[in-house]
Amino acid sequence: SGEVTHKDSSGGGGTIQTGDVQWMTAGSGLVHEEFHSPEFAQAGGLFEMVQLWVNLPAKDKMTQPRYQAITRQDIPRIDMDEGAGHIRVIAGEMGGHLGPAQTFSPVNVWDGELKAQYETTLHVPEGHNTILVVLKGEVVVNESHKVQDSSMVMFAKDDIAIQLQALQDTQFLL
């Protein structure tokens, strides 16, 4: 929630708001800063942001830096049955929906919400590094591990089916 402005030495930048995503590729290098927009600084309010860092493949480390401002309207949303929640596909693919982030590594970033007492099974590509970050709420993973908010779980590369059962309304990244 909130709003943040980004500027960088390659000329990239913009202001993202709740539900938007900034995807920055450092590549051959750049200097950047992130700060509250003047409007948000004046009005105040809650600010929450998650940053994920993905190592570029060796062949792409000297690529030109790039900034992608992705608005929430451009992120495909997959609604679950019975109003159980939804998944937003930021990067990669899910169920035929492609995320708008342009990546160098094969990476899926899914932003999900699952309502209390519902469950879902998410299928990830075999061989991928997979991490679940519970931003808010509480889930049981694969019927055995309780994961609370502000926690993360790393899966074995052969865990291609990940079952989530929400004990509370839960927001997560996978």
Segment roles from a protein language model:
Residues 51-58, 71, 89-93, 113-116, ...:
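Short, structured patches in soluble enzyme cores that scaffold and shape functional sites
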Residues 14, 20-22, 32, 48-54, ...:
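Generic beta-strand structural signal
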Residues 7-25, 124-125, 130-133, 138-166:
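Short acidic-glycine-tyrosine-enriched beta hairpin
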Residues 53-87:
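Long amphipathic alpha-helical segments that form oligomerization/scaffold cores
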Residues 1-5, 53-56, 109-115, 127-140:
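Short, conserved beta-strand element in jelly-roll/cupin
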Residues 9-11, 26-60, 146, 157-174:
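Ligand-binding loop in jelly-roll beta-barrel domains
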Residues 1, 76-121:
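A short glycine-rich, His/Asp/Glu-containing loop-to-beta-strand
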